[in-house]
């Protein structure tokens, strides 16, 4: 049985309720980004950094209790960490870092996509470093990979794939990311209990969709 997505946003309607485990996932993503950005800029010789951050299943950006979603958390974390890094560089008499960070936020639901644009704009984060795309993550993957390759030889990038379904980012897609972008980082999450139920289906198409 197909699972109904309860995380839909629509301008003028009630916001979705975020569950506790989703809040924990957001905290993990935030902590990971801070640690990773510090890792990439450690050492006194580092003076610039190009990085692409792709949120493949981003939702509308805010929940009913005021909790912000991954697009806002990502932006806030990066901006905060950039300031801390350069403050520490300055106090250590090291050269500050020039950051060139691009964000790609993908949401397949049209209403949620429109809500996301509104949320980003309300927070002042809908600017030239941000690209919002309406559609399926896999449909944009080739374009995203090409853009990353054209931007930098280092190809530094993070894919945040907090998928609601279980075949939205199948194994061959993850493999393709690592093959095309060897320095990519991928944060992949899904519900294990629900995944077991999903795999219990007798339809061979289920395993095929996941690349198994």
Feature names for model-found ranges:
Residues 3-4, 20, 148-160, 164-212:
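Class I S-adenosyl-L-methionine
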Residues 52, 102, 156-158:
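Structural motif
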Residues 53-61, 108, 188-193:
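Short loop/turn segments at strand-loop or loop-helix junctions that form parts
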């Amino acid at each position: 049985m197909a699972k109904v997505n309860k995380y839909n946003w629509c301008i003028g309607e009630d916001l979705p309720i975020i569950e506790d485990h989703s809040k924990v996932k957001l905290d993990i993503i935030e902590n990971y980004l801070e640690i990773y950005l510090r890792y990439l800029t450690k050492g006194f010789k580092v003076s610039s950094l190009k990085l692409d951050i792709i949120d493949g299943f981003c939702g509308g950006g805010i929940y009913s209790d005021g909790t912000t979603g991954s697009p806002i958390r990502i932006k806030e974390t990066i901006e905060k960490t950039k300031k801390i890094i350069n403050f520490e560089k300055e106090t250590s008499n090291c050269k500050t870092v020039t950051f060139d960070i691009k964000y790609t936020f993908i949401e397949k639901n049209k209403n949620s996509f429109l809500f996301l644009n509104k949320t980003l704009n309300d927070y002042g984060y809908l600017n030239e470093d941000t690209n919002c795309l309406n559609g399926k993550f896999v449909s944009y993957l080739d374009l995203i990979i090409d853009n990353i390759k054209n931007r930098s030889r280092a190809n530094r990038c993070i894919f945040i794939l907090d998928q609601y379904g279980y075949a939205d980012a199948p194994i061959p897609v993850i493999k393709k990311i690592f093959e095309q972008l060897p320095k990519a980082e991928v944060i992949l999450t899904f519900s294990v209990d629900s995944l077991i139920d999903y795999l219990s289906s007798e339809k061979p198409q289920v395993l095929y969709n996941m690349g198994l």
